[in-house]
């Protein structure tokens, strides 16, 4: 027992050190200013960034307000750093809707529309002021419909008319993904804009499976084998590339085969603003250093945007677990 007690501080220190090392690998900076400074090295090589303020769902109104302030400060900082580069060439921000309201669920639909939507609109107008892209992050499947309703309302705001910086994230492991793309294409047509759509494979697989089992559902909302998700991803990529006037595709993948397939699907007549690849900070840079850059330097001359989490090591755990599962 004495040996056990004396070992506790050592174990604690070891865990803390491990978390810090992992944090340095996966987090761009503890503050947005630090993250912007750390990003310059890869920006000089042609990479772009989309920043995300780390943290999970808000549990109280105070949490939601703190996240709101954090996002506002980040947009101001990113906007100044962008210096007029625009939504395609400059940095952007990703926001999580569950961080903006403690009751973000279908059961609280009216409250969400009344209380969360004004916050989303306010952040989007601020992003427009600086002309930086703002992406609404994907979450669990039971929040998909409400997030699409919020997006639709946003797309028809008169103050945002004609601006193409609104973005939305879709997950290829969701069985509904191709149908969601059809809806987004229709929404872009009706609202007369070009939407930025980030296609990811999906990071909530374990919780989606467990939730479906606990609820006694007949089937799962997500594919149960990775190979199905890989095929779905390419099918969805093809749909996104087919409507370049309505969709700006952002292909987030660390899979070299998927990357090569999209490179071929998109054709060789690339033009700036056609599409971009994306990767997570600390995970995809070695692959994309072969992609981003001039053909004369042996690269593919295709843009890559790095998804860059910002936050302290205390806020890292949930994000880190998802990355380790990947």
Describe the residue ranges of each PLM region.
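Positively charged, amphipathic and often flexible ligand-engagement surfaces
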Residues: 1-326
């Amino acid at each position: 027992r004495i040996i056990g007690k004396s070992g506790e501080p050592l174990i604690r220190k070891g865990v803390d050190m491990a978390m810090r090392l992992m944090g340095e690998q996966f987090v761009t900076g503890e503050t947005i200013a630090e993250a912007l400074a750390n990003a310059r090295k890869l920006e000089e090589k042609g990479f772009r960034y989309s920043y995300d303020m780390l943290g999970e769902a808000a549990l109280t109104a105070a949490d939601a307000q703190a996240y709101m302030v954090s996002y506002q400060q980040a947009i101001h900082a990113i906007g100044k750093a962008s210096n007029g580069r625009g939504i395609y060439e400059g940095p952007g921000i990703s926001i999580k809707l569950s961080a903006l309201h403690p009751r973000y669920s279908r059961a609280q639909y009216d409250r969400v529309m009344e209380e969360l939507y004004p916050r989303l609109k306010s952040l989007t107008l601020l992003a427009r002021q600086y002309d930086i892209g703002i992406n609404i992050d994907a979450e669990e499947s039971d929040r998909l419909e409400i997030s699409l309703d919020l997006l639709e309302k946003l797309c028809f705001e008169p103050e945002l008319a004609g601006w193409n910086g609104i973005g939305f994230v879709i997950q290829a492991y969701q069985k509904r993904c191709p149908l969601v793309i059809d809806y987004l294409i229709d929404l872009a047509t009706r609202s007369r804009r070009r939407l930025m759509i980030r296609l990811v494979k999906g990071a909530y697989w374990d919780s989606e499976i467990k939730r479906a089992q606990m609820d006694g559902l007949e089937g799962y909302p997500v594919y149960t084998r990775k190979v199905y998700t890989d095929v779905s991803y390419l099918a969805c990529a093809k749909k996104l590339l087919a409507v370049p006037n309505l969709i700006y595709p952002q292909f987030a993948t660390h899979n070299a085969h998927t990357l090569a397939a999209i490179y071929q699907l998109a054709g060789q007549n690339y033009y700036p603003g056609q599409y971009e690849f994306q990767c997570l900070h600390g995970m995809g840079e070695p692959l994309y250093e072969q992609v981003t850059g001039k053909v004369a330097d042996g690269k593919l001359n295709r843009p890559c945007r790095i998804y860059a989490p910002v936050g302290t090591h205390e806020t890292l755990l949930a994000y880190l677990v998802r990355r380790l599962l990947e």
